[in-house]
Amino acid sequence: MNEHNIVITGFMGTGKSTVSRLVAEKLGRTLVDTDAEIEKRIGKPVARIFAEEGETYFRLVERRMCRFLAAQRGFVISTGGGMLVDDGNRDVMLASGTVVCLTADPEVLAERLRADQSDRPLMRGNWRGLLEQRRSAYESIPIQIDTSHKSPEQIADEIVALCQTASV
């Protein structure tokens, strides 16, 4: 597998998981969801890792996962929303392949997050403040796709076309 990775990131509610799955299916690549991988390796859900070990511990595990995956080739990687906020993680992933940051209008995010019943540790706080804190990190990623008024299928097709043009 000589192909570069395709890394899909963004704030919670932007569609990372759904879009990543579709991109992997369309390209016949293996999908790696970083949060799911961390859960598998640690043996507990992310929410429990946050509750029992704290965010600092989680970010350390996440950093290790980032470096491990960046050394692999040919994956579609769906990151946790905070993984590429870390400058080092972002640089490592940018060097490993094509990184796409999914965005959405705050009003659209609010609607999606209200409809999402999953247990997101950082949802318990002020998600708008968290989005604002992460904004500059997300904006530093060169490829941005606004998911506000597009279907997951449209977004996946856009990413596939982008990667085929770039020969990723």
Residue ranges and their predicted role:
Residues M1-N2, L22, K26, Q72, ...:
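NTP-dependent small-molecule kinase module
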Residues A95-S136:
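A glycine- and Lys/Arg-enriched "phosphate-lid" helix/loop adjacent to the NTP-binding pocket
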Residues I8:
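Hydrophobic anchor at the beta1->P-loop junction of P-loop NTPases
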Residues T34-M83, D87-L94, A137:
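ATP-dependent small-molecule kinase phosphotransfer cores
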Residues T14:
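ATP-binding Walker
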Residues S17:
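Walker A/P-loop
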Residues F11:
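P-loop (Walker A) phosphate-binding loop of NTP-binding proteins
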Residues E25-A36:
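Post-Walker A helix-loop "phosphate-sensing" segment adjacent to the P-loop in P-loop NTPases
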